[in-house]
UniProtKB/Swiss-Prot annotation:
Part of the 50S ribosomal subunit. The keyword Transmembrane does not apply. This protein binds to the 23S rRNA, and is important in its secondary structure. It is located near the subunit interface in the base of the L7/L12 stalk, and near the tRNA binding site of the peptidyltransferase center. The keyword Ribosomal protein applies. Keywords: Ribonucleoprotein, Ribosomal protein, RNA-binding, rRNA-binding. Belongs to the universal ribosomal protein uL6 family. One of its GO terms (molecular function) is rRNA binding. This is Large ribosomal subunit protein uL6. GO terms for cellular component: cytosolic large ribosomal subunit. GO terms for biological process: cytoplasmic translation. InterPro entries: Ribosomal_uL6-like (IPR000702), Ribosomal_uL6-like_a/b-dom_sf (IPR036789), Ribosomal_uL6_a/b-dom (IPR020040), Ribosomal_uL6_bac-type (IPR019906), Ribosomal_uL6_CS (IPR002358). Pfam families: Ribosomal_L6.
Amino acid sequence: MSRIGKAEIKLPDKVEVKQENANIKVKGPLGELFTPIFEGISVKTENGIVKLERSNEDQKVVALHGLTRALLMNCVKGVSQGWEKNLEITGVGYRAQKRGEDLVMSLGFSHEVVYKAPKGIKIDVQEQLKIKVSGIDKQLVGQVAADIRSKRPPEPYKGKGIKYAEEFIKKKAGKTGKK
């Protein structure tokens, strides 16, 4: 049996889980999310505890058992606490600022880079060098952070660019001159 799939999910206060056709609807204080229920997986809710059970031991169903539980847990945490990713900008003259709902970045190009946040994502800028991406959907928060990072990924010689706050950049040695 899947170790992840058989683990129970304890629902926090004010979080509801309902099954609607082939989806699970998770509603909480921060909003609501939907996650798919794969064929062969059933969801049971009792006394604030959600259990996932599978109908048979096919390899595909066994694989999807843990996945469904992980996706459901991400939804529960998202609607109760939310998700966030922090980015840092390193480099002389590199900076970010908010202009309305857009993120405007100066990253050493001849033009400013403008990033429009998708619906459900909040972007905050602190000290012009730190960007915080937050929202209730873990996948969308991670994708937005990756999109922002891809505008100027850190380079390996000086580390200039946009990196995740917890990311370590392995630096290369520069050229050695001819003697």
